């Protein structure tokens, strides 16, 4: 849908501009659609990459946070089915609703030597509690998840109810309402929560310990301080329980 694609570009560029970020250009990502199945081909999205730069010198972590805010603001006005795979100064995400062995064929970029990366995270899984969709392909922006979050409905509701409890001098969490996706996959919602905590300045390991804690009864006899850490943060963040692997 060319109209929806143009509306998505305009919306994202506007919010980037509001965050002090200049749009340098857009690129249509080359794809080999013949490797797609019938269902994937019927839902095939327009896949483009945006290139941006800060309008003035800015610290690396501040730039990443500005990109996050611009994306979250823009998402509120996106047409249906528009989705940002990644908007980062660290990583580039490639998603596809294809068999894993067909990823390099679907994205010729992945075979280009000039696009080689020092680190690559690859993940595949089949949908269990949600219907397959392009935007639900793994990995997400900060995590790859295999399994099910058995407490997902409660986690989503508590993120709405307790969202006001999260405070940071770096970000206004009220801008992010709803804090997590209420309709996507469980992995997607967990990824939303993780990136919000990171944008607020929390350390990655600290954030993961808060979201996916062990049973505190196991810790109390070993490390009372660590048990107190989990109990404190548990007041405003229920465990995302049930993941097989993250």
Each model region followed by its residue ranges:
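Conserved short alpha-helical segments that host acidic/polar catalytic motifs at enzyme active sites
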Residues: 1-246
């Amino acid at each position: 849908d060319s109209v929806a694609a143009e509306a998505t570009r305009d919306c994202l560029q506007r919010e980037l501009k509001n965050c002090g970020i200049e749009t340098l250009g857009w690129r249509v990502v080359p794809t080999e659609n013949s490797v797609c199945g019938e269902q994937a081909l019927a839902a095939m999205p327009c896949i483009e990459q945006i290139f941006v730069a800060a309008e003035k010198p800015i610290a690396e972590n501040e730039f990443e946070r500005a990109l996050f805010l611009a994306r979250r603001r823009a998402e509120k006005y996106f047409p249906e089915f528009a989705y940002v795979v990644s908007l980062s100064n660290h990583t580039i995400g490639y998603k596809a609703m294809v068999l894993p062995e067909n990823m390099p064929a679907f994205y010729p970029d992945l075979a280009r030597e000039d696009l080689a990366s020092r680190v690559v995270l690859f993940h595949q899984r089949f949908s269990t509690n949600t219907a397959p969709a392009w935007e639900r392909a793994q990995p997400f922006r900060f995590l790859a998840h295999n399994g099910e979050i058995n407490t997902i409905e409660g986690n989503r509701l508590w993120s709405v109810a307790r969202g006001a409890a999260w405070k940071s001098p770096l970000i206004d969490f009220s801008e992010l309402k709803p804090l997590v996706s209420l309709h996507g996959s469980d992995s997607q919602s967990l990824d939303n929560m993780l990136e919000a905590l990171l944008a607020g300045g929390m350390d990655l390991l600290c954030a993961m310990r808060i979201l996916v804690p062990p049973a505190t009864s196991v810790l109390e006899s070993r490390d009372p301080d660590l048990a107190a850490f989990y109990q404190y943060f548990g007041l405003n963040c229920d465990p995302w329980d049930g993941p097989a692997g993250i």
